[in-house]
């Protein structure tokens, strides 16, 4: 059989495996790469290679993550797998590996377990938009009714966290059996189940919108006044596109202002437009230098609003990661570093939570002293005197 050509023109999607410890996330990751390698769509990665995940630092937090890549007939995937539960929590909260969708691995022999629930909840909180389920270890379950029962439990659990449980694709199989078959050089009955899973992922997880197609947003890093030309605001465009003549809003810290872009520059050259990822200077009509400061954002009018009060899901750095050595309580007042600036805020812990220890993850309510442009999924760091003590993501906006 002729191998298909590996091409880079397919749409790109980021996914990852989530689920309870020992339910087979890493084995499934290895099985997917092994089965697809037989079709010339991936390089085979063995279990140990994925399991010995290198440690990476993301905003000072140590996270062990394995990245593998593979293709299906329709897409190119970047796939992340984490060895430990704590690594998943950190990964999802910091957005170190942004996921467009996830494969939830549940052992058919055990059914949903505490971390199954926690990963679904985290997916909801941090905005992983779509989940496909793989019921693993099917070879260990003789009773078809038991399999159906586990499937029902998983659907109920997904629905409880506002995922469409009834419509979620669920594929049963055995990652280990598929991996063994693939290592022997063939796609057998178990390998077919892995291919079926990937066909569901292809069909169910939509291709994400490209950053350039989203609404324009640029965090303000610096502001200059250029004689005879006006005020230039510099920063890296987070998403969208900005062109000369566009109306933009300046949001955060002070009342929102509207203005018009009269120039876009990169490396002192005039551009027709700046797009996501570009470091640019944007010239603003009639805006005074003192009206704009670091920590504000330039955006498409009406696309993002300033807020002071929100709920967030946070991970608190352990002492070993350079975090606090002691717990904190309600009314703790650190700085919240959002995009390009620190804003002081006070924390309220959930009812029944007395204190938060270094190394914990928890949901908090925050009230900032000045409003910042926020939306669901905005990432922030929690700092004390310039040192990072936590990381979080906005899960709900209150006011």
Swiss-Prot record:
Domain tr-type G residue range list: 10-209
Name of the encoding gene: tuf
HAMAP family according to UniProt: EF_Tu_B (MF_00118_B)
Subcellular location(s) per record: Cytoplasm
Protein name: Elongation factor Tu
Intrachain disulfide bonds: none
Residues that bind GTP: 19-26, 81-85, 136-139
Stretches for region G2: 60-64
A Pfam family recorded for this sequence: GTP_EFTU
Gene3D superfamilies for the chain: P-loop containing nucleotide triphosphate hydrolases (3.40.50.300), Translation factors (2.40.30.10)
Catalytic activity as recorded in UniProt: GTP + H2O = GDP + phosphate + H(+)
Subunit text: Monomer.
A single cellular component GO annotation: cytoplasm
Principal EC category: hydrolase
Gene Ontology BP annotations: translational elongation
NCBIfam families named in the record: EF-Tu, PRK00049.1, PRK12735.1, PRK12736.1, small_GTP
């Amino acid at each position: 059989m002729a191998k298909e050509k590996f091409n880079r023109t397919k749409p790109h999607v980021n996914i990852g495996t989530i689920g309870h410890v020992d339910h087979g996330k890493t084995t499934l990751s290895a099985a997917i790469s092994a089965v697809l390698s037989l079709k010339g769509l991936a390089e085979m990665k063995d279990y140990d290679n994925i399991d010995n995940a290198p440690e990476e630092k993301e905003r000072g937090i140590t996270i062990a993550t394995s990245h593998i890549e593979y293709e299906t007939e329709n897409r190119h995937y970047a796939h992340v797998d984490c060895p430990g539960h704590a690594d998943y929590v950190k990964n999802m909260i910091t957005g170190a590996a942004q996921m467009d969708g996830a494969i939830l691995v549940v052992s058919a022999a055990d059914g949903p377990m505490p971390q199954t629930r926690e990963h679904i909840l985290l997916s909801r909180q941090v905005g992983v938009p779509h989940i496909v389920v793989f019921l693993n270890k099917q070879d260990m379950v003789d009773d078809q009714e038991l399999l159906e029962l586990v499937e029902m439990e998983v659907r109920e659990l997904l629905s409880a966290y506002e995922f469409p449980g009834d419509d979620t694709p669920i594929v049963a199989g055995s990652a280990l059996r598929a991996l063994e078959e693939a290592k022997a050089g063939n796609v057998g009955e178990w390998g077919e189940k892995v291919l079926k899973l990937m066909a569901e992922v292809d069909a169910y997880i939509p291709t994400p919108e490209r950053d350039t197609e989203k609404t324009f947003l640029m965090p303000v890093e610096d502001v200059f006044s250029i004689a005879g030309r006006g005020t230039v605001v510099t920063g890296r465009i987070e998403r969208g596109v900005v062109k000369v003549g566009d109306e933009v809003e300046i949001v955060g810290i002070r009342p929102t202002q509207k203005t018009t872009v009269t120039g876009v520059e990169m490396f002192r050259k005039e551009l027709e437009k700046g797009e996501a990822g570009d470091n640019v200077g944007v010239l603003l009509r009639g805006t005074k230098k003192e009206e704009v400061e670091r920590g504000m954002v330039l955006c498409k009018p009406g696309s993002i609003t300033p807020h002071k009060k929100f709920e967030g899901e946070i991970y608190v750095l352990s002492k070993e990661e350079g975090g606090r050595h002691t717990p904190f309580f309600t009314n703790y007042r650190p700085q919240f570093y959002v995009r390009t600036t620190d804003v002081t805020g006070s924390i309220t812990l959930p009812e029944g939570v007395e204190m938060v220890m270094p190394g914990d993850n928890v949901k908090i309510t925050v009230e900032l002293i000045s409003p910042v442009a926020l939306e669901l999924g905005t990432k922030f760091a929690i700092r004390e005197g310039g040192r990072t003590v936590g990381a979080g993501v906005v899960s709900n906006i209150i006011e």
